[in-house]
Curated annotation (Swiss-Prot):
Keywords: Calcium, Hydrolase, Metal-binding, Protease, Secreted, Serine protease, Signal, Sporulation, Zymogen
Gene Ontology terms describing biological process: proteolysis; sporulation resulting in formation of a cellular spore
GN (gene name): apr
Signal sequence, renumbered to the chain: 1-29
Record-given protein name: Subtilisin amylosacchariticus
Gene Ontology terms for molecular function: metal ion binding; serine-type endopeptidase activity
Source organism phylogeny: Bacteria, Bacillati, Bacillota, Bacilli, Bacillales
Amino acid sequence: MRSKKLWISLLFALTLIFTMAFSNMSAQAAGKSSTEKKYIVGFKQTMSAMSSAKKKDVISEKGGKVQKQFKYVNAAAATLDEKAVKELKKDPSVAYVEEDHIAHEYAQSVPYGISQIKAPALHSQGYTGSNVKVAVIDSGIDSSHPDLNVRGGASFVPSETNPYQDGSSHGTHVAGTIAALNNSIGVLGVSPSASLYAVKVLDSTGSGQYSWIINGIEWAISNNMDVINMSLGGPSGSTALKTVVDKAVSSGIVVAAAAGNEGSSGSSSTVGYPAKYPSTIAVGAVNSSNQRASFSSAGSELDVMAPGVSIQSTLPGGTYGAYNGTSMATPHVAGAAALILSKHPTWTNAQVRDRLESTATYLGNSFYYGKGLINVQAAAQ
C-alpha cells in the first residue's frame, strides 16, 4: 500500500515538474516572439571584406535571424529581440542597427497632365521614350493590361511572388502615367514607348518593408535601369535606404520619388523618405490649374511639381480610373526623364535632373512648390 502511494506521489511530482517546465518554455517562447521585430543591421566600412557567413554569424550569435544580405549596402535584414539589438549595437563590427520601417503608397481621357507638362511637343518630334528602361518600384503591374508594355520585373514581397499581379492597383496606375501605349484605347502615357519593369515591393495593402524596397532598388541597379519611379515613402529615415538610393544615382539612374501626402505643417518639412534624400528628385502635386494640392507635402527638400489631382490612368483588369496623390505626380517626372533620355541618350542622370529643375515653370514659394512645374519640352532643348 505504501509502495502504491509512493508511486502515485512520484507520478504526480513528475507531472507537476513537466507541466511547470512546459509552461515556462511556452512563456519564454511567447515572450521572445512578442519582442522580436524586423531590423536592418549595418556593418562598418572597415568590415566590407567580411564574408557573408561571418556577418551572419555576428547576428546569429546574438540570437538574431538573418533574412537577407544586401548586394550594394553593407548590411543585412534580420529579426531581432531587444537583447540582440542591444548586443549588436555594442559589437565593434556593427555600424548601426535600425528598425526595418514600413513604407506606404502615396495614393489618394487622355490625362490632362500629359499636356500640362508639354509632353506632346516631344511626341510630335518622334521622341516617345524608346530604348529607355523604367523601373516602377511599387505594388506590381498588371502585365495583362492591353495598354501597357511590361518587359520584365521581380517581386521582393515574400507573400506575393508575382510582380505581374497588382493587388492594390497602385503600381498599375503609376505605370500607365509613365508609359501607357499610344494606341486606339484608354489613355496615353508621358513616355509611351518606354520599357516598363515591374519591381514589386509593396503588398496588396499598399505597404512594404524598407528592406523590400532596398532589394528592389538593388535589382534596378543590377538590371541597368535608366529611371526609377518610387511613388511611395515613409516618415522615418534609414541609413541603408539612403545608401542604396545614393548607389542607384551614382550608377547613373534618374530617381524620382513622391514627396508625400502629408500637406503642410507651418515651417516644418513634411516630405517623406526616400524623397527627402538629396540624391532623389522629390515630387509634389498640383491640380490642372497649377495650384498646389492641399495634400502635397512641403519642405525645403521639395524639387519639382507635377500633376497629381484626378489623374486618369490604367488599373488592373484592363480598366481605368482617376487617383489623387503625389504618387500620381511622380510618374509624370519619371516619364519626362525617359522622354529626355530618348532624345539625348548620352546625357547623364545629373544633366537630366538639372534640365528638369532649371526649366521648371515657377509657381511660388519653393518650400511649397520646389523649382516649379516641370516642362519637358523646355528641358529637352
